[in-house]
Amino acid sequence: MVGRPRGCGERTGNAIASWRVGEPAAAALRAALSDRKYLARTRRLVPRWREKLASSLEGLPLKIFPSSVNFLLLRLPGWDVGERLVHYLGRRGILVRWCAYLPGLGPDFVRVAVGKPDQNRKLVRELRRFFRHGT
């Protein structure tokens, strides 16, 4: 876990699913964490971007779970929608996490990152298209 309180990893053990981080991603993370101005700006802006993204998703046939981090957990309207949605978005250059195999979730859950405003607008636009056309 990145940014966890000391000892948190030992206490959580196997209670949460892990995500492996490859060396290129780890190098990018080290570079991003070394830029203090970027970190401060991001911490200030992400909550605003997250709220805007969540409000933009209202009216779509999905449940938006409350979040205090840089992603939103979404429950889709059926167990058969998640995989189709992940492929649909992927073909449009939008990567989301399908939660089919995460304990306590299932194939009707996806996790979307809170991006920059233009990235969030693209995500919302494509989600609207997906649900409008049932692709």
Identify what each model region corresponds to.
Residues 91-94, 101-135:
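PLP-dependent enzyme catalytic core of the Aspartate aminotransferase-like
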Residues 18, 98-101:
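Short beta-strand/turn micro-motifs at beta-sheet edges
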Residues 3, 73-75, 113-115:
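Short hydrophobic/aromatic beta-strand micro-patches
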Residues 47, 59-92:
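Conserved PLP-binding catalytic core of the aspartate aminotransferase-like
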Residues 1-58, 62-65:
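PLP-dependent aminotransferase class I/II
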Residues 31, 52, 56-60, 84-94, ...:
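Generic non-transmembrane alpha-helical segments
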Residues 8, 78-80, 102, 118:
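Residues that cap or initiate secondary-structure elements
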